[in-house]
Amino acid sequence: MGKTLRTLIARNDESFSFLYQETIDAMGEVTFFDPETEVPCLDGIDMLYLPGGYPEKHVDALVKMEATRQAIKDYAERGGRIIAECGGMMYLCEAIVTDEGEFPMCGVLPYKITARKADRKLSLGYRRFMLDDKEYRGHEFHYTQFLGETPKSVTQVYNAKGEPVDTPVFRFNNVLASYTHLYRILEDYK
């Protein structure tokens, strides 16, 4: 029998709330933390999962938790395994820009996300992509965008019709991040 995966999951009512029970059930031994109020203990975990949500609505609380953001950045730079989807990916970026200003996030990914009302654009639909000879499937739903040009993706993402879309997928050390909410995460990302 193999080792049980130990996963730390960011979770709260809105910033990191897009969690599916089947995903949680597949993640082995799970513990939760709230990035708005807690500094995570990342020692001894096998993976950090940052699900989607609305971090752009809670930037003040996330900014106040500088120790949390730094701990996650340090974990990523040491090669810690992270899966970040949509809002989780936004949290890993340099900053989130809202109508109220620019707010620093974890700084793992060198991009800025705009959540300004004038920049909103709906991105919605099923997505699939290949990475390391594995097919990933999921869905995308967000109004936020990258500030400036869309960053280069490590792979091409397609919609349900098989047409290419501009949704980037990022890899940094053991970090996998995208706007795509993935299905069967652990079956695919091993």
Question: Each PLM stretch: what is its role?
Answer:
Residues T31-F33, A84-E85, S178:
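General beta-strand structural signal in soluble alpha/beta enzymes
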Residues K3-R6, L42-G44, A76-R78, A84-E85, ...:
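Short gly/pro-enriched beta-turn/loop segments at secondary-structure junctions
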Residues E36-E38, A71-I72, L92, V165-T167:
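Generic recognition of flexible, low-complexity loop/linker segments
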Residues P55-R128:
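Cysteine-nucleophile active-site neighborhood
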Residues M1-A67, D74, I113-D119, Q145-T150, ...:
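N-terminal beta1-alpha1 cap of cysteine-dependent amidohydrolase-like domains
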